[in-house]
Design a protein with these regions (language model features):
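Active-site beta-loop-alpha junctions enriched in small/polar residues
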Residues: 9-13, 35-39, 64-68, 89, ...
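Short, acidic/polar
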Residues: 13-25, 67-75, 116-124, 173-178
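C-terminal helical cap(s) of enzyme catalytic domains, especially alpha/beta-barrels
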Residues: 98, 149, 181, 190-210
Length: 210
């Protein structure tokens, strides 16, 4: 299994703030994510700006698409994204349309696993050609003290066995990494930890290598 990639999630409210973190951290990460909040505030220009700033990085448009998969995929990939997220609750037709456009554009679709979904859903996504999903604890779950548990790991292993590679996020610490040894991990996604590293670097502390 190849080394998991490191993804910087930019959940800023302004592009200027996001690009400051990118300047500090882009040499330490493999993937740069135009987060949902950033894209809602800054529009398609956020993806375009990050592509210009990071010509050699994988760019993710984290749009959590629920409909109009073909149209939005065309816009995302046309703006320079390599991957685009579709929410797990989207109709299978939306996933199919988005995936077909991704294939035409040389990109990939990631299924965002929020809320209710089943392994039968995952099999359907894999059957139509999708090979990536995102598994995470959301902000509210982390705030309530939810930890990575056996149920999470069992579901991730089941997804891996279906053939999906997972990007994992939700308050991961170095001590957590051994928990994922049997999982097909595509990437670990970091938000606040990497942002904190950027602030330390500004103060002269330096950014740890990814």
């Amino acid at each position: 299994m190849s080394r998991p990639l490191l993804q910087l999630a930019l959940d800023h409210s302004s592009l200027e703030a996001a690009q400051r973190d990118v300047t500090q951290l882009k040499d330490s990460v493999d993937i740069v994510e135009a987060g949902t909040i950033l894209c809602l505030n800054e529009g398609l220009g956020a993806v375009k700006a990050l592509r210009e700033q990071c010509p050699d990085k994988i760019i993710v448009a984290d749009w959590k698409v629920a409909d109009a998969g073909e149209t939005l995929a065309q816009q995302a990939f046309g703006a320079g994204a390599n991957w685009m997220t579709i929410i797990c609750a989207a109709p299978l037709a939306t996933v199919e349309k988005g995936h077909a456009m991704a294939q035409r554009c040389g990109g990939e679709i990631q299924i965002e696993l929020f809320g209710n979904w089943t392994l039968d859903d995952a099999r359907d996504w894999h059957r139509i050609g999708v090979r990536q999903a995102i598994y995470h604890r959301g902000r509210d779950a982390q705030a309530s003290g939810q930890q990575w548990g056996e149920a999470d790991l069992a579901r991730m292993k089941a997804l891996s066995d279906i053939g999906l590679e997972l990007s994992i996020t939700g308050g991961i610490t170095p001590a957590d990494l051994p928990l994922f040894k049997d999982i097909r991990v595509k990437a670990f996604i970091a938000r606040r930890a990497l942002a904190g590293a950027a602030k330390s670097a500004e103060g002269g502390g330096g950014v740890p290598a990814g």
